[in-house]
């Protein structure tokens, strides 16, 4: 109840009003965040019987598409923090099948992932997975799971386990969290 009142107030803030009216915010990442939050808040409002809030939020989760360009990557004209459009393009979203369709389907999505992780074009390091030391990249390997390529996911996680997390190979060791400087 107190939380729902805070949600109602937040819906009237300028940035959220802008999001409701235009479907986009200054940064593509923030647009994606707000779309995901909108879906969660809609569910919460309905669970607590606040149809009025649910109606204000209804459909805003669809604005996630506005964070992406036609090539299936996040918008090139956006600013990014601790990364670039590649680093943020493989975050999980609620509408994962539609997300993959932006890339031409699962095959196109996997092709972008393969490039990002260096399975193809190993010489091109301009748009590359930076590792588990960068929080913007930590979710990215799991995009392979959504695309049905658990083999690739396991390969990345196995490699990370051996090279990053095990003290015997120079990693941080058991319980280590590389790059967690926040």
Predicted stretch roles:
Residues 2-62, 66-182:
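Active-site core of glycosidic bond-cleaving carbohydrate-active enzymes
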């Amino acid at each position: 109840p107190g939380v729902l009142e805070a949600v109602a107030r937040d819906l009237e803030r300028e940035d959220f009003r802008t999001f409701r009216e235009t479907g986009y915010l200054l940064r593509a990442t923030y647009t994606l965040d707000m779309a995901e939050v909108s879906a969660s808040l809609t569910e919460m409002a309905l669970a607590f019987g606040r149809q009025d809030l649910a109606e204000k939020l209804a459909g805003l989760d669809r604005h996630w598409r506005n964070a992406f360009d036609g090539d299936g990557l996040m918008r090139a004209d956006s600013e990014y923090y601790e990364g670039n459009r590649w680093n943020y393009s493989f975050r999980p979203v609620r509408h994962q099948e539609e997300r993959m369709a932006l890339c031409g389907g699962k095959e196109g999505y996997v092709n972008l992932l393969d490039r990002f992780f260096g399975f193809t074009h190993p010489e091109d390091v301009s748009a590359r997975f930076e590792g588990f030391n960068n929080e913007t990249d930590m979710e990215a390997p799991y995009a392979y799971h959504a695309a049905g390529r658990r083999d690739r996911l396991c390969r990345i996680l196995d490699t990370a386990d051996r090279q990053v997390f095990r003290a015997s190979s120079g990693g941080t060791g058991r319980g280590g969290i590389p790059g967690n400087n926040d």
